C-alpha cells in the first residue's frame, strides 16, 4: 500500500491531476456561459431585419475592418456564416445595434445571409472595443504583456470593458454587485451620485437616520450641498483614520429648523429631516429632488450597483426628459440589463435543448431500443468497475487507460455478437 501511495505521489508530481467531477463541472460552467451570451441571439439568421436589436451578441472582424478602417459590428449568425475563418473580436453583448455585415464598411465582402442592406447604420455606436482595445489603458484582452490577473468589468452605460484596478475603487466581490458605472459615465450622468449614496455597493454604511454617511473609496471627492440648503448648515468633518484602516470621510448635516422641545435629541432631528424630505417629495413628486435635498459626496470613481437598482430611479416627466437628453433612457428599461438578456437565452436554450439519447431512442424500433439500453447498462457497469480499481489502488487514470478500456469493451462486444448472444448480460 505504501508503494502504491508513493507511486501515486510521484505521478501527481509529474502530471496535473484533474478529477472527473472537476472536468464535468468546468464543462457545464462553460456551456452555461456560452448559453447565457449566445442563447438570446439567433445563430442562423442575420439580425439586420430586426432593426436595432435591444441587446445581442456582437463581434468585430479584424480581417475585414482592421484598425485604421471604419469600425463595424456583426451579429452571431454572420460571424459563423460570413466570417468563420476570419480573426474576430468578441464584444460580448451590446444594446441597440444593427448588423453591419456586408455594408459599405466591408470593401470586399457581401453578406451571405442578407446581402440587401443600407450602406451604413447611422444609429449604431462604436468604441475602441471594435478594434480589440478595452479600458482607459486601451489594451487588448487577453493582454500578452499584462502579468497581473484582473477581472474585466463592463460599464452598463458606455458598455466599454475595464480592468478592476483602473476603476478608481476596488470592485466588491462579483456576487455582491450586479452592474457597474465607470468614472467617465458617472461624471456625464452626475445625477447618479444622488442615488449612489442610498443604493451603490461602494457605500459602506448609512446610520439610523441617514444624517451620517461613511463612504469608502479611492479618488477625489466633491461635497455637494443640498439644493434646498437655505435652512440647513452643512459641515464636512474629516476624521483621522486609525492606523491600518482605509480613509473614511464623515459627512454630517445639521438641521437648524424651528425650535422644538428636546431638539438636540437625535430622534427629533430625524423627525424634522424626514418631514422636510416628505414635503419636498410631495411638492415635486420627484425622487431625485428628494435625494438631492440631502448632502452628497461626488467622487472620481466608478460605482457598483446591486440587483434591481434601476427600478429605484425616478420616472417623473422631468427625469425622463433628463434621461433622454443624456441618452440613457435604457436605464429605466428592465429588459435592457445583461441579466435579463442572459435569462432570455437560458429559457430559449432549455426549451430547444434536447436529450441526444432520447432523440436516438425515439428514432429506433422496439428491438433496437432494447439493444441500445442493454449496451448502455453494460458500458456503465464495466466502466464503474474498471475505474474502481484505480480508486482502490490510489493511482491516476491516464488517457492510455481509458483507451485500453474501450478497446477491451469493443472486443467483448464483438465476441458476444459472434456468439449470437441476444440478451443483456
UniProtKB/Swiss-Prot annotation:
Changing residue 305 to S: In LICAS; uncertain significance. A zinc finger (UBR-type) spans 44-116. The modification Phosphoserine is found at residues 264, 354. It comes from the Eukaryota. The keyword Hydrolase does not apply. Residues 225-246 are annotated as: Disordered. It catalyses: S-ubiquitinyl-[E2 ubiquitin-conjugating enzyme]-L-cysteine + [acceptor protein]-L-lysine = [E2 ubiquitin-conjugating enzyme]-L-cysteine + N(6)-ubiquitinyl-[acceptor protein]-L-lysine. The keyword Mitochondrion does not apply. Its EC number is 2.3.2.27. There is a cross-link at residues 225, 252, 274, 398 (Glycyl lysine isopeptide (Lys-Gly) (interchain with G-Cter in SUMO2)). PROSITE patterns: ZF_UBR. Expressed in sperm (at protein level). Pathway: Protein modification; protein ubiquitination. Coiled coil: none annotated. One of its GO terms (biological process) is proteasome-mediated ubiquitin-dependent protein catabolic process. GO terms for molecular function: ubiquitin protein ligase activity; zinc ion binding. A zinc finger (PHD-type) spans 132-188. E3 ubiquitin-protein ligase which is a component of the N-end rule pathway. Recognizes and binds to proteins bearing specific N-terminal residues that are destabilizing according to the N-end rule, leading to their ubiquitination and subsequent degradation. This is Putative E3 ubiquitin-protein ligase UBR7. It comes from Homo sapiens.
